[in-house]
Amino acid sequence: MKISIKKKYRFLLALLLLLSILVVIISNFTIEVSARGKTFTDPANTPKNKVGLVLGTSRMLVKGGVNPYYANRIKATIELYKAGKIEFILVSGDNGTIYYNEPTTIKKDLIKGGIPDEKIFLDYAGFRTLDSMVRAKYIFGLDSVTVISQKFHNERAIYLAEKKGLKAIGFNAEGITGKQGVKVQFREYFARVKVFLDLLFNTQPRFYGDKIEIK
């Protein structure tokens, strides 16, 4: 019996869907396993590093109010610094327009939290996590770093960092539950697939630039 074109199409579509799901699962599992034992939630148990790398995000939500992901990263950074587990802070984020400047905004809030101005360095070209990790190594000359973000983000950042020759651990800012948290976690699955595409195609940061010494 001949298989109709419609049935062939459905079979190929189902196969493609299955393969896509497998890619997502494998990508997520690989990154999660790779980061085991490398992220921390208690400053007392967190190894010391010269530099803590804060990954930027928007301060305000689209619908108004402070972004809890942002607020929790600020809190975690201040906590880790005051515990003596980092000496300097590198803030890496998006500075794509004159109206949007993640690093400067974060720096202001860190200073309000008691961190000295001279201890904070800014990376204005951290448009993506990949950019932040590569630039930390090649622009700021770091061999090791403590990444500060939510756990799911730290895991991805650590995987990227190690693939780019940067030793990294993560200090986990508090996560978010509810609808907003679910939405972000869902997007994270696909962000992890993109990690492997970036590594496969050797994607480079948008900008490099002059070297900056953190001291």
Language-model regions, residue ranges each:
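Short linear elements at protein peripheries
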Residues: 203-215
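A transmembrane-helix-recognition feature enriched in membrane-embedded lipid enzymes
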Residues: 182-204
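Structural motif marking the loop-to-transmembrane transition
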Residues: 2, 6-10, 178, 182, ...
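Enrichment for repetitive, rod-forming helical segments
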Residues: 17, 80, 199-201
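A structural signal for short, hydrophobic/glycine-enriched beta-strand patches
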Residues: 29-185
